[in-house]
Amino acid sequence: MKDLLKFLKAQTKTEEFDAIKIALASPDMIRSWSFGEVKKPETINYRTFKPERDGLFCARIFGPVKDYECLCGKYKRLKHRGVICEKCGVEVTQTKVRRERMGHIELASPTAHIWFLKSLPSRIGLLLDMPLRDIERVLYFESYVVVEGGMTSLERSQILTEEQYLDALEEFGDEFDAKMGAEAIQSLLKNLDLENECETLREELNETNSETKRKKLTKRIKLLEAFIQSGNKPEWMVLTVLPVLPPDLRPLVPLDGGRFATSDLNDLYRRVINRNNRLKRLLDLAAPDIIVRNEKRMLQEAVDALLDNGRRGRAITGSNKRPLKSLADMIKGKQGRFRQNLLGKRVDYSGRSVITVGPYLRLHQCGLPKKMALELFKPFIYGKLELRGLATTIKAAKKMVEREEAVVWDILDEVIREHPVLLNRAPTLHRLGIQAFEPVLIEGKAIQLHPLVCAAYNADFDGDQMAVHVPLTLEAQLEARALMMSTNNILSPASGEPIIVPSQDVVLGLYYMTRDCVNAKGEGMVLTGPKEAERVYRAGLASLHARVKVRITEEVKDGEGNITTNTGLVDTTIGRAILWMIVPRGLPYSLVNQPLGKKAISRMLNTCYRVMGLKPTVIFADQIMYTGFAYAARSGASVGIDDMVIPEKKAGIIAEAEAEVAEIQEQFQSGLVTAGERYNKVIDIWAAANERVAKAMMENLSTETVTNRDGEEEQQVSFNSIFMMADSGARGSAAQIRQLAGMRGLMAKPDGSIIETPITANFREGLNVLQYFISTHGARKGLADTALKTANSGYLTRRLVDVAQDLVVTEDDCGTHDGILMTPVIEGGDVKEPLRERVLGRVTAEDVLKPGTADILVPRNTLLNEKWCDLLEESSVDSIKVRSVVSCETDFGVCANCYGRDLARGHIINKGEAVGVIAAQSIGEPGTQLTMRTFHIGGAASRAAAESSIQVRNKGSLKLFNAKSVTNSAGKLVITSRNTELCLIDEFGRTKESYKVPYGAVLGKGDGETVNGGETVANWDPHTMPVVSEVSGIIRFADMIDGQTITRQTDELTGLSSLVVLDSAERTGSGKDLRPALKIVDAKGDDVLIPGTDMPAQYFLPGKAIVQLDDGVSISAGDTLARIPQESGGTKDITGGLPRVADLFEARRPKEPAILAEVSGIVSFGKETKGKRRLVISPLDGGDAYEEMIPKWRQLNVFEGEVVERGDVISDGPESPHDILRLRGVHAVTRYITNEVQEVYRLQGVKINDKHIEVIVRQMLRKATIESAGSSEFLEGEQVEYARVKVANRKLEQEGKVAATYGRDLLGITKASLATESFISAASFQETTRVLTEAAVAGKRDELRGLKENVIVGRLIPAGTGYAYHQDRIRRRQLNEPAEAPQVSVDEATANLAELLNAGFGGDKK
């Protein structure tokens, strides 16, 4: 027995390892893995089906085919364990060793490993410094390479053709050594002296100046160093021994009908063995060189195909003409080892079925069909049956269950009680796609789902299916109950809003019961309380909507949790009073004393959660649902065609629009407007008409006139069913009702452009054939889009998860004082996102002061919850610096304070929370709701483009930011700076509106003046850019020569003449170098200086500028000297929706990006070339000037002599995030990406917390490029993990050495995922071959820090409940404690024994 226990112990292999290293395998290493050489290509004997000896399935090498039985059958049973049969040479052991024992093939000639040869950049090529083409020619026996030059003029690794080789032989005899084939490459690699080579290259690096050469040298140095450090030998990249995969991993399966299905690998191996054996024979026979060479080449090709079929030349195909699956194909791609078997596996104890509604369930329950439960919980039932003594053996229990005896059902009930199951609906886009429920047994075959969790699962009941999983172990059950129970997931991790919100019928029911109606039955009653209200309603004495007075008792909790009650009569309705009965005590009555739409209900649940906590909220949500369903049924709201009331005004509006269109058509035909303008105007007219029809329709639908008690007429909100459904948010929207009862409006073509003839009919009137045809256009596009969208969205999520997977909260506080400044998002007159929503759940980075005082309002490191946010709003704080993941100082991971609140729980985040994955899911999950299309600015959109004034909406005072201005003769301000912002501040000092003001705008009111709502505060001409004079004086023309640099033009309509500056391309010879400008002089003729500088006021005019003043005219400051027409760039496409989000996260440089100033200084223009201008910026402190060539067609925002700051926009365009990072820093790029991504989601009405985007940005910024190495071991220009630079610099500073300097890099998410430290994670993401090749050559260690690596090696992940386990292991490793030896308990031993004995004795029962 002792031996047996010892044997069982030996079977549990060690799981204690800290890292995984990948390296090149040396021939000795391969031989040490091997259990024997495979000499024959045979697989199994066709008659006996026994494996052939020395073949690919040989039992002697790989192990027995049957458990504990040798091949010839001499030794059977467990007692001969470990014996090697003398007859057939097979060891008697378990057959599963055939999954792990490897063999090998001794190759007759070395062959190069194709990965190191062809995976770019070619490692062999880099190492030998030879072009890949040359190496290939040597390998495939087309030319010779000099291995040893000896005393001759031949260089080492020089390529010789056949003729050159023969000539050299004649000339030098055997002074030199040249070979061909892999042997040649092998000996070249063997002769490399890595250390010396490295030294030489480093010296070269210091001497060289050319950029390309430096790059090449650094690459080679890095590769050489990798070889030196990792202990890999270069010659191992050429194989002399080929390992053979264990046979059970490349099985040969007999099919019925005597045929066999085989793995492609067997074919590939067979091919290698055949060629190898033939080559051996040829060598023994001393065959002619040319034949041997051919055979060697074929062997090389066979090995290539085995390792990576199709990488070189045509892929080898099988009998069915499709390429064979090689070893590389086994691990890469969606069907490869990583993604198919390691990252996701099929699991036992699971089932799936269609789902239906369970409206009577509680929130934590799901209905499980009895049949399914019986199958899923079988082992538990067997155990219980045996325990109770109802069945003597497992077999008997099995029989009972199969017969479905009555007692079995009772046992099932017991087993299921308190045993949660997991329900999952594919696609699982975020963590709420798997939740735990307590099963309730039901008849039938469909799983019943609680309606409120449908939103989280995105489930509906039109045939969706769901899978059930049973957590088996106690720990798993505990986790399911404590963390995954649906009642614990009330808030969405993406936005922190409740995700368990009623929708559809429930909303309709609640809306119906909380509406009031004029002169309803029972109006004016005074009731003692909600109970009486319900009684009068049930008795039919009062209607649900009657306006009554009811005595209501409210309980209010204060900060300390003391409860005060106040009771009083409230004006309300019967329905609201009845609803009040289910509202938890502690919430104010005002929450229900309003018509409840979807938003109001969501707010009510949110308030309930924040005030009352989890349990009351869950009970309340359930009650809301039951009540809602009940009253929706009572309301009897239904839809008939007469409910779609068509407004009378419709015909008139459409006639007016048609008249306008006709007028524009006439203008077009008489040539007053261009085709583009006509198209845009027509679309504008129809869009406006559509809006008017919709408005008339909604006015018509939403109100009705009724007679009240006093007999007077009164307007009240309508009880039209369609309107109620839309108004409550239950189903439908104003846009849809517009199509039913208004007009369908403008339709789009599949390419996104708008068809200019609208559909004037609606669905109630019906469409004619043409209208119907136009409609089908857009509808089909929609369907095609949806399919594309799903795939793209899924891929975006995958990339996001991959880049962020290893980000986990690892400490409580990193102690940084850094953070990002949060301000409300304001666009024009709208506050898109108030400050409180942006800072809620964040931690302050520094003390927040009361505005205008030095009192501390909120101390540093405070988690801003709802109460603090209310305080901030009362004190009207405008901007707050909060901690952010981007500025977190934690090396690997983030700290809790920088992250702030765990949105799904409402308190500060716990250590070990996988914030990276949560962020990725939160951004990716709504991806399918985003549009795929790029918007054309045309029609409705172009109206916004040509704004020419600012009208404020609210009363307040104006404030200008980064503004330079001059006062013109009329006493108004003229803006002379580029990125000016104008904000409107209310009386509390809060920013209400914010506008961009262009250069040359004239302000009606000055800085700090008060304005009223609706006042126009700024005007400008949208179509031209003025040149504004900053000084007063007399104009002098410089270099303005008629016919050379300018021409005169006369306007046909007005008769006024103006000067137009010629573009330098249009000028003749002498005019080329002239630079037309306007100088401003005083009465004496001296130059006037620009105030505050010693520069004369002269304005250089670009081509196409129009001057309407004459030489010698006196002007005053603020006057327009010239106008530059702005070409409208036609209809520019704005990338919207999903592609835009992907572009931002991939950090793609836009086409024609904005040009930003690289340094601060004064702008001037140097010598021009054919198509480009030379922009020169001279720093004010007299440093080196910065020059840049800019294409002529770019419109510049700066004039000569203007002062720009670093990072200012010189030429407009979409900004490149890389430029923003380089010139404005990390915070600016974070702000840019966050705002741009939010912009896309906001358009779709999706709420995502900024945090999640910041988390991804942090991961995009995790690399840095070394600028100067200091005393560190980094190379200049090397890209290193930012955390590693920080750690190294800290160490260097402690030792008093020079730290390395670096610049942060922004990587797109795909690149960032592939550039991670962990090769396992990168290889399982994309480009598996390249990642593994790189890692093997460098001998990389994977420290298994991230989640993915740990999933792949089959451990608990270092996050969530696995976090403690990993922390414990790290602690033990630091204390150098021995890993606990795996203890085998008696139970396990008996279980294993039983398994062994069953295997031994019951083998022949099959």
Swiss-Prot record:
Keyword Magnesium carried by entry: yes
UniProt GO MF annotations: DNA binding; DNA-directed RNA polymerase activity; magnesium ion binding; zinc ion binding
Cross-referenced SMART domains: RPOLA_N
Alphabetically ordered keywords of this record: DNA-directed RNA polymerase, Magnesium, Metal-binding, Nucleotidyltransferase, Transcription, Transferase, Zinc
Cofactor: how bound: Binds 1 Mg(2+) ion per subunit. Binds 2 Zn(2+) ions per subunit.
Cofactor annotation: Mg(2+); Zn(2+)
Example GO biological process: DNA-templated transcription
Protein name stated in the entry: DNA-directed RNA polymerase subunit beta'
Species: Photorhabdus laumondii subsp. laumondii (strain DSM 15139 / CIP 105565 / TT01) (Photorhabdus luminescens subsp. laumondii)
Lineage: Bacteria, Pseudomonadati, Pseudomonadota, Gammaproteobacteria, Enterobacterales
